Amino acid sequence: MKILKKILTITAITIVVIIILRNNYSMATDINTNYCQKLPVRVALFAKDLNDDYLVFLRNKFEDIQKNNEGKVVFTFYDAKFNKSVQNADIDKKLKEGIDLILLDIVDINNLGETISKITQYNVPVIVFNREPSTADVIKPYKKVLLVGADSKQAGILQGKMITEAWNSHKESIDKNKDNVLQYIMLIGEKSNETSIDRSKYSISTIQQAGIKTQELASPVLNWDTETAKSTVDALFLRYSDKIEAIISNDDSMAIGAVQALQKYGYNTGNKSKVIPVVGIDGVPEAIDLISKGFMLGTALQNPNIADVMYDIGMNLVYDRNPVEGTSYKLDETGVAVRIPFTEYTGPMFEYKIK
């Protein structure tokens, strides 16, 4: 009888302990969940250059997202000004202060693996954007790291198609020396950069595949900068003058600088007899304005909702969901990247209708 009482007592105590522990665990879980829901998600965007037209565009979009999601998310923005040491110091400081999501436009793409490794030690998810490594293997080892990027090959192809359409429809205006060869200047964003390489390669190969002979006059590396492009194209115009028949730029920032330089000499101001087709990539507001006025031929338009896509994917990473859950996008063949397609945008430079 005494043994039975002991067994019953021990059993009762065990049950009570289990119930208490379970209740405490449930309370802790509820507290943690509510805590996460009450706190706004802290997002830090680290940019190579916040004055870049595309980054200005993205920053405005993210600020709109914050306004429309008050209390849910807070964005902070850090400008490395092309300085790797500054960016590394900013990241280190923010990791120690506490952060929930990092959007990374890295200064030195060769430093990406080391930077991601450091960030993931804090269990902070990362979205890499605007610049990408030559191989996805740098990203693959990390569960909470994703690349959100565009298809640079497609962007180059669209540029080539726009130039081809212009040449085929208005060759008499473009082929100034009547040699049946398209003389062009290629404005390069960065040397040894995969995005620059693909955009340059596929724009020209598309033109050549259409049966158009080409000759490159110059291919300066301009670091994606408007003012550098303006001064460089100014100098190239003085050197080549009427030989320049098209300018193909790796992005809109440099294309804008090219248009500004040409306008100094009376080109691309609306006079149909003095036109040099200029194409860019991204679809930033200033480029769209130049295109709509007929001062720039066109651009490969980045999806204007890309900030929303990055936000949705980022929130999925923060809350341990499938990164593309609730979006219309899917991971590419690497399993660690989402590709946002470009669309062609042209204006009335040669009386085109805006597409």
Regions found by a protein language model. Give the residues of each.
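Structural motif
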Residues: 74-100, 218-240
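Short, solvent-exposed amphipathic alpha-helices that sit
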Residues: 54-68, 155-159, 194-213, 232, ...
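Extracytoplasmic "Venus flytrap"
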Residues: 35-61, 65, 69, 76-91, ...
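Short, low-complexity disordered leader/linker segments with a strong preference
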Residues: 1-41, 117, 121-122, 353-354
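Hydrophobic alpha-helical segments within soluble ligand-binding/sensing domains
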Residues: 147-180, 229, 283-287, 303-321
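Hinge/cleft segment of the Venus flytrap/periplasmic-binding protein
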Residues: 22-39, 180-191, 303-355
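Flexible loop/hinge segments that line or gate small-molecule binding clefts
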Residues: 117-154, 179-180, 284-290
